[in-house]
From Swiss-Prot:
Zn finger spans (C4-type): 31-53
UniProt protein name: Acetyl-coenzyme A carboxylase carboxyl transferase subunit beta
A single BP term in Gene Ontology: malonyl-CoA biosynthetic process
Residues of the CoA carboxyltransferase N-terminal domain: 27-296
Location in the cell: Cytoplasm
Length: 305
């Protein structure tokens, strides 16, 4: 769906001579929020946002790559494959078997697609998580791709865009899954040292160790309207605290109101918003004031060792 974010907003038009036998089974989609039926083509033309209530439905990683300029994306680290370091087995199936089934169903090696692309002719590194792959749980490959993306952005001197959704750390990989939180965060310090920004986009749902680590230390944190963002889930918190939580708790709007994120941006405005942010950073990096400051630093006396 390279043209996903550039589709026309035309409504659905049907042929009057179609009989019921020719109507495909997946012609309609029911909105999980307002429960209204929507023509699938109309929904896709509207970037999978319900035209009746504005509910933002989930996108795949490949669909999110439609934010980039057409033909600009080049995938990196596609050869990284998850392993089963613990030989994890439950009564139902092994982790290795579950991985194989998920890979066959999704056509993905793991939950993250990473690479180099451009938005409005401005080069960036990008890493996108896909919730359809084991809930985008963060395992060794997820963390490695995110860390390499940060290091690649630092090496190339370009911004990093991460699009984040997750249910948390991948339990089947134990402490190896948990350590990805620290690994990715440390890689981002090298990006900061290179003077390049990390823009994190949080989409529904984003929970657990992912929320608690690298997206939360981004330079700019953006969320989609209505996205659920948190560490533990709302129901779990209510069970532990034995009291009801405030209305809208853990939604993007709640997080914005309490200063946890910077912006809530509708999907239809996302590409233009990212382009505007990238232009601001580009102007900052090429400003005369910054060049003068860099020159002053270069002439500072070196410390005596």
């Amino acid at each position: 769906m390279k043209e996903f974010f550039r589709l026309s907003r035309k409504g659905f038009t049907g042929r009057e001579d179609q009989d019921s036998a020719q109507i495909p089974d997946d012609l309609w989609v029911k909105c999980s929020s307002c429960r209204e039926l929507i023509y699938k083509k109309q929904l896709n033309d509207n970037l999978k946002v319900c035209p009746k209530c504005g509910h933002h439905m989930r996108l795949s990683a490949h669909e999110w790559l439609g934010l980039l300029d057409v033909g600009s994306f080049r995938e990196m680290d596609a050869n990284l494959l998850p392993t089963d370091p613990l030989g994890f087995v439950t009564d139902e199936e092994s982790y290795a078997a579950k991985l194989a089934k998920t890979q066959q169903r999704t056509g993905m090696a793991d939950a993250v697609i990473a690479g180099i692309g451009a938005i409005s002719n401005m080069q960036i590194c990008v890493a996108v998580a896909d919730f359809s792959f084991m809930g985008a749980s963060m395992g060794s490959v997820y963390g490695e791709k995110m860390a390499r993306s940060a290091e690649r952005a630092a090496e190339l001197g370009v911004p990093l865009l991460t699009i984040n959704t997750s249910g948390g750390a991948r339990q089947q990989e134990g402490v190896i899954g948990l350590m990805q939180m620290a690994k990715v965060t440390m890689a981002l310090t090298r990006l900061a040292d290179a003077g390049q920004p990390h823009i994190a986009l949080l989409v529904d749902p984003c929970y657990g160790g992912v929320t608690a680590s690298y997206p939360s230390v981004a330079d700019i944190i953006i969320a989609e309207p209505g996205a659920n963002i948190g560490f533990a889930g709302k129901r779990l918190i209510e069970q532990i605290m034995r009291q009801k939580l405030p209305a809208g708790f853990q939604t993007a709007e709640f997080m914005l109101e309490h200063g946890m994120i910077d912006m809530v941006v509708p999907r239809s405005e996302m590409r233009d918003t990212l382009a505007r942010i990238l232009r601001l950073y580009r102007q900052r990096s090429t400003s005369p004031a910054k060049a003068e400051l860099a020159g002053r630093r270069a002439t500072l006396p070196q410390p005596i060792m």
